[in-house]
Structure formats: structure tokens, C-alpha cells
Amino acid sequence: ADFSALNSRIFGTVEYYTSQTNNLLFNINIPQMNGLDKIPSNIGKMSNKGFEMTVTGIPIETKDFSWDVTFNFSRNRNKVKSILGIDADGDGREDDLISDKIFINHPYGVCYDYNIIGMWQIADKQNGLIPDGFEYGTYKVEDVNNDGKYTADKDRKIIGYSDPAYRFSIQNSFRYKNWEFKFMINSVQGGKNYYYGQPGKDLANPDNIYQNNLFNFDYWTPENPNARYRQLGYYTQALGYTFSPYVQRSFVRLQDVTLSYNVPASFLSKFKVNRLKLYVTGKNLLTFTDWDGWD
């Protein structure tokens, strides 16, 4: 829906959508045979709903000076409604496809893993509190079923989602006579439990620290016991060498900045030039984020 107000000094569009998609193409894990461990299949149902809004305002407009600003906002949610249609355990509810981390009535793209609740410390080792397969400086994870063991089928759970919660951007444009200054702020936000990623996987091999220049990673040492990541080069057999915390990738970025000048036509006519615009521009000049992985 389009709207405008104050003699079109404010205008924009608002859209809400909902849809359902059937027979999605997806690679299903299968028992490995003939070198194949996945097969593409048309399966499942997924619902989508979202909200998008664009609003433009012109706070100031005179002969020599103008200022306009545009705000964009979008939010999308999907939900898996069906996968294979199988209820193997007979509980009256369709089974999740855990091997592919697809869960009924959850968004596609879940972070299904062990839940980190802390870090094992040297004092825990001295007091005999660290279970077999772990060491100080490694992740302490939740024992979901309280059996004293850490197994993939019993102790992993949904701890978040990889898709963003929402996106927004703000673009400002200022014009004074022949000068124009524009800048855009862009942001992707995770909100609660959304837009997660795992930047700490390279810590399993200390060589990666040197090859990828990861010295700024907040990794565990005896002098840094409350670090975000475990000690370098050591991983637990229970969790595997690629396991690392899920960290929100939310950011706010000064994405585009441009300063331009339109050379007056009266000056250009002397050189038989119709139009000339001089400008300088910068991209991704500032980023505010807690994410320390690759962009």
C-alpha cells in the first residue's frame, strides 16, 4: 500500500505478505553408497510471511538547500510445516529431520548444537570436576538429559537461527546549490536468538592463527580465563574440532558516503562541455559489531 502526507513531504509504501511453498528441492542425507551421501528430492512444505516498509521524508526544501531522508525496514519469517510426512516413533507428530537440522514448526536454518554454558578452568581440573574427554580451557556444555554424558543425539538442542530478525537502512541526502552530500547507514540485526554464525572454527589448528591473522580472537589462556573461545589447538573428542560458540552477526555499518559537485554550466560552456560532475565516494567506512569472523 502506498501513502503520502503533508503535501507529499512524507510518502512511502508498506507491504505484508504471506505464502506457502510445497515440494521444495532439498538434498537429503542418505546412507553412503556408490560414493553418494545425499540425493536431491522434492519434499516438504514451508510457510513464509514478512513485512516491508519504505518511508521517504523531505524535512527541508528551499531554492538553495534541501534535505531528504529514506528509511527502509524488512522482516521475514519462514516456518517448516512438513518434511517427509513420516511419524516413525508413532507419537502422532511428524518426525524432524535431525540429520539435516530441519525441524517441524521452526524456521529453516536452525543452529542445532551443544549449548555452551561456560569454560572449564584450571581449578575445575584440580578439583576433579572436568568429565572425561574434556580439559581446562575447553567449552563447558549443557548436559541436556542429565545423564553425565555428552552425546550428539541426546544433548544437542536448538539454540538459535541463522537468518536475521530484521534489516533496516537509512539514507540521507543534503543539497546546497551545486554541492550534494549523501550517506547511507545499513544494518542487519539478529534480535533474540537470530542471525548466528560460528567464527571460531579455525582455532582447532594453531597454524590457522598465523595463516589467517586471527590474533585478535579472544581465546582462552590461564591469564584470560573468561575468553569467548577455547584455548588454541585443543579440542575435545566429545564436541569435535569444528565446534565453536554461536555468535550474533548483527552489525550497523556506514556503508556509502558521497560528496559531489556539479560544475556550473556557465563555466563549462567555455569548453563546449554540457555537464561535468566531480565526486569522491567511500564504502564500508565504519562497522559496529560484536562479530569477529569473516564478513
State where each predicted segment sits.
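Flexible, solvent-exposed coil segments and beta strand-coil junctions
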Residues: 28-38, 93-94, 145-153, 231-243, ...
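Membrane-embedded beta-strands that build the outer-membrane beta-barrel scaffold
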Residues: 1-5, 10-18, 51-59, 67-75, ...
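Outer-membrane beta-barrel and related beta-rich outer-membrane complex signature
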Residues: 24-28, 32, 75-100, 190-219, ...
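Conserved small-residue
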Residues: 41, 51, 58-162
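Solvent-exposed loop/turn elements at secondary-structure boundaries
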Residues: 16, 26-46, 89
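Composition- and surface-driven signal marking solvent-exposed, interaction-prone regions
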Residues: 11-16, 26-30, 66-70, 84-87, ...
